[in-house]
Amino acid sequence: MKFKYWLTSLTDISNAKKKLLHDCGITAEKLFFMPKNELFDILFFTDDDRKIILESRASYDVEKEWILFQQKDIGFVTMEDEAYPDKLRNIHNPPYSLFYIGALPDKSRKSVAIVGARGRSAYGCEVAKVLAAALSRQGIQIISGMARGIDRDAHMGCLEAGGNTYAVLGSGADTCYPKENRFLYDKIKASGGIISELMPGTDPQKMFFPMRNRIISGLSDIVVIVEAKKRSGSLITADFAMEQGKDVYVIPGRITDSLSYGCNSLIKQGAGIIYNIDEFVSDITMTGFTECTQMDFRKNILDKKEALVYSLLDFCPIAIGTLSQKVPYELSELFEVLEDLIQKGFVKETIPNYYIRSL
């Protein structure tokens, strides 16, 4: 592994060329000790590539650097290893290697990416959390990028449901970005994994985020966009997903809402529409992934009154007055039912007398 770590450190040698080395049977160790004249037999190397390799070999201490890396307690895998995610092997420009803290996604389980706007609405926040939680209860892994907004909401929804979630970073795996997500970062390490193709210690840079998006989509079976503006980075993830042959789904939105522009545009391009979370989860869940459906889960917890009130709520706040006109209960009784739903975690009161679903 120490020679693979050296090859990974040559960041100016592209992933594509590292993959070609692998395909040609040229291991990292063989490259490290290859005579200078034989480097010219590797026709896809440029003179600059050969210069990078020769200069690195002259100054790089393989043993020392590998020992220093091992002290960081970070996992490391390359496309030459069996543990490398199979879903990434055949995408365009697969990362030669991955660093991770925690674990890599379980190859035997489905994964869904949930991404979207950083400056999301309260509605988008709730949808992302509820969707992630619903999928997690069916044993589906959640992939996202730990950015502010929808990414964070998706991770939180999964964790709150006891699921496994994985964050692909635009920095080194040992660099928490944004810093305010430190609590989330630590929780993901314990319940899933932090993943990056970048060398440990790498600070986040703007150019790294589009690069990591191809890994988010690549690790996933399905990509869901919750909210996205016209130039949202999550649309890059959607483009990668379509290029990789993955299904893309969106949460539809109001045509007057700038946060809906990206999703509505994807609908125009043929993306799937999530109009009911329970049905979406049911449709994509394969036999063997679930012990019970979402509706069964709720029926086991809610009584008839609670189920009725819950069915009338959405992820947009509804006033108590509007709600009272739709149920055959006195206002005092309705308040009691809502309070019970809040205690059970199914409903939130966003502002006094306005309620939304939280599950």
Q: What is the predicted function of each stretch?
A:
Residues T78-L359:
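Glycine-biased, small-residue-rich flexible motifs in mid-sequence functional cores and linkers
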